[in-house]
């Protein structure tokens, strides 16, 4: 307390009122204060060579403590460090300013809370502090030699720090010796006290091995991804038909389908029952007309090919025919009659619109047609004549066709009917003539 009484500048300082970490005795020596003894526990258990280096720096710190010029600059960045590092730095500032007449009140005011941080943060996790100090290590002022001096003073007068604080203290003055805050090169003589490899998590081997392991993991992942891309089926284009094949198959399919007597709707329904994929009549029609996309044509071709094989194999088997007929309605074959045969049937119809069964049989034999075909043709012809003949006409179609003979007689007949006078309300001649005119034009 002799220093506080003799020095008027430190009378109101909070460093002495709150219990300074270090005190200066009357003989000029340095000893630990009571607050420092109660706040920390355990002695300094370090390497003897480090103690020797610290003792050498302590002598330089004692000589530098008389000039307070470096302390005013050092205080500007001491308070910007993390809590644990700032606590150790503030303790060093307080120790150096104890015998300096140039100490200002802001330094003394910041000394007390930083001293409390030394007490409260003595058990902090060294991982957090080591990471933070590792990134903030280059923050040194221009007076780097003075910073090394008060760093050694801190190491000499606070020997009872815990293991984590010792590491933080080592990180304070183990910054890279090549650069300063302003980016200028430091003097050649200023070197780091602690080898960067001793800092936990900053070893080059660990960093290199971690980087190598990460790179190796990425390389394996890239190989797996590349192998996954190239592991698709190699036989994707072997069975793909060409456009010419699809066109030929569509034409052949249409001919065979008509020959078998199935409609497009029957084929679509049969595909749904046999293979599980129901297709509409429009889809089958578009396939035959080559109006589907190439992809859909390729998908539909094997199904239609299977259906054709099934239909061909079931031609002589009643059970197979019934199986296919159950998928849809089987249409009868459409009969196409030649022009000469149709003329013979027409002439026979004019003579006898309703032939008997014997006449139909003899006519079918003469024309080499089936009996059912001849019978159906006469039925359809009578229905057609009934649609063309209006009701109330006294003349029969046979009489009309027998009178017509050729087109000239028809024209004369229409002229005569149109030149007659106004008909009576009950007369139907004009209406009948116009109706016959429509019938003849239709033929």
UniProtKB/Swiss-Prot annotation:
Q: In which tissues is it expressed?
A: Predominantly expressed in the central nervous system.
**Where are the compositionally biased (Polar residues) regions?**
101-121
Where does it reside? Answer: Nucleus
- Which residues, as ranges, make up the DNA-binding region of this protein? 330-389
Query: Is 4Fe-4S set as a keyword in this record?
Result: no
Keywords recorded for this protein, A-Z: Developmental protein, DNA-binding, Homeobox, Nucleus, Phosphoprotein, Transcription, Transcription regulation
GO MF entries? DNA-binding transcription factor activity, RNA polymerase II-specific; RNA polymerase II cis-regulatory region sequence-specific DNA binding
UniProt domain POU-specific: residue ranges: 238-312
Q: Which GO terms describe its cellular component?
A: nucleus
Fetch the SMART domains from UniProt.
HOX, POU
Which spans does this entry mark as compositional bias, Basic residues? Answer: 210-225
Give the Phosphoserine positions (modified residues): 317
Region Disordered, residue ranges: 21-40, 100-150, 182-244
Gene Ontology biological process terms from the UniProt entry? brain development; regulation of transcription by RNA polymerase II
Q: Which family does it belong to?
A: Belongs to the POU transcription factor family. Class-3 subfamily.
Function comment: Transcription factor that may play important roles in patterning the embryonic brain.
Q: What is this protein called?
A: POU domain, class 3, transcription factor 3-B
